[in-house]
């Protein structure tokens, strides 16, 4: 690897002698301008934050042709000193790599040094979710009406937390116990269209979950337009962690309820098309995300057949 990097460095210096000057900061400006027109606001905001917070402060004044593998490697090592998670480091690397790939295609950058260094960081593969018996223990210790309503909604519907935060009273039909998903919410762009066209859907939930939601509504003196935005996400996550610890169950994030719901349906052998429709995903996305559940199910079926 070291010999390859040195050779690559020498090749870089030879190629960049007559190249026009462009700093990484200048590249970032035009790259993000293009990125903004082709991506959703949330994706743009996250990419911009990655670039301005973790790339430009150390490398912004450099000519893009001077970004050799050695420099990229030093930057990657610097990230390790910041105490960031592996998934965050992966995101910073991916944003940087994508920007340089764009520069190769549109700005005449000779080569992308990430082809030598690779992208560092890892994505957490293990999904945190609750077994059904854990959910019952957790639900028993939830005392706050807002938390009770939100967590029951998330567990029994599998909707995304952003979709829950975008719900209005009109989106909930308590006669049929049906929730209509037609929008989502995030702290960057506020209310916006759902993640994909598959995300537009109607989801039926148990009557008991609806009862908790109605009780929460009744507790408000004046019902907000978006009731589930009553608490900020950080507070919701902190409350959930506290409840999980108190109940002695797996500590999950609010998104973990979505994984819990999907895993529960898979283990009850609900058809995958129905699961995908309920989650607002494609069948391929369900298989990719929850393949471990299907493998476990296959093992259980094989063990059952051995007894025949």
Question: Language-model segments: which ranges?
Answer:
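C-terminal catalytic core of tyrosine-transesterase DNA break-rejoin enzymes
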Residues: 105, 148, 152, 156, ...
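Short, surface-exposed polybasic/aromatic micro-patch for ligand or macromolecular engagement
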Residues: 1-21, 196
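Short, leucine-enriched amphipathic alpha-helices that occur as contiguous helical runs
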Residues: 92, 135, 146-148, 233, ...
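N-terminal core-binding DNA-recognition domain of tyrosine site-specific recombinases/integrases
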Residues: 20, 32-113, 124, 231-235, ...
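Basic, Lys/Arg- and aromatic-enriched nucleic-acid-binding interface segment
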Residues: 90, 105-111, 115-167, 175, ...
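Conserved tyrosine-mediated DNA breakage-rejoining catalytic core shared by Y-recombinases
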Residues: 133, 166-215
